[in-house]
């Protein structure tokens, strides 16, 4: 299964909603990129990047429930990290309410919300969509 850029917003929103992740801020944007993989023409996994120069927000990681525990989430994150690094991103940030252990296993560490770069603080994910109780994490590439 190959991972590639995707831009079909309805398909992206459908998988995010099925995984109970926010969709209200998904719209065409130069700074928001999505990558995904399909199986039998069905989107089964996605990950997003909001890129702001040397920092980026890793977001919207979603895997079809029937495809979980098969390494797809890790593959999507690895792909997103490599793509971000190829664009000059030095630090990736993320917010999660349920997957902090998963991301810790991939090298992400807890980060201070107060010390978040202003570009990250200004994202809709940071400023409103994700609750204050979300784990805020960072990985330096």
Model-flagged regions — what are they?
Residues 1-25, 38, 134-136, 140:
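Short amphipathic alpha-helix that is part of the acyltransferase structural core
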Residues 8, 54, 98-99:
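A generic "binding-loop/recognition-motif" signal
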Residues 29-31:
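Short, small/polar residue-rich loop motifs at catalytic or cofactor-binding pockets
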Residues 36, 42-50, 55-62:
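Conserved beta-strand in the GNAT
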Residues 63, 69-82, 94:
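Conserved acetyl-CoA-binding loop-helix of GNAT-fold acetyltransferases
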Residues 82-98:
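Conserved GNAT acetyl-CoA-binding A-motif
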Residues 97-123:
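Conserved active-site alpha-helix within GNAT-family acetyltransferase domains
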Residues 116-141:
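C-terminal "cap" of GNAT-fold acetyltransferases
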């Amino acid at each position: 299964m190959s991972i590639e850029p995707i831009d079909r917003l309805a398909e992206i929103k459908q998988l995010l909603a099925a995984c109970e992740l926010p969709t209200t801020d998904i719209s065409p944007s130069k700074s928001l990129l999505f990558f995904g993989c399909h199986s039998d023409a069905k989107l089964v996994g996605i990950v997003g990047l909001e890129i702001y120069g040397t920092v980026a927000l890793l977001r919207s990681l979603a895997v079809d429930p029937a495809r979980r525990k098969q390494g797809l989430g890790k593959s999507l994150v690895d792909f997103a990290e490599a793509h971000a690094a190829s664009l000059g991103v030095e630090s990736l940030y993320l917010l999660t309410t349920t997957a902090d252990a998963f991301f810790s296993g991939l090298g992400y560490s807890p980060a201070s919300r107060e010390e978040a770069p202003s570009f990250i603080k200004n994202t809709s994910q940071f400023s409103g969509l994700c609750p204050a109780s979300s784990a805020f994490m960072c990985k330096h590439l």
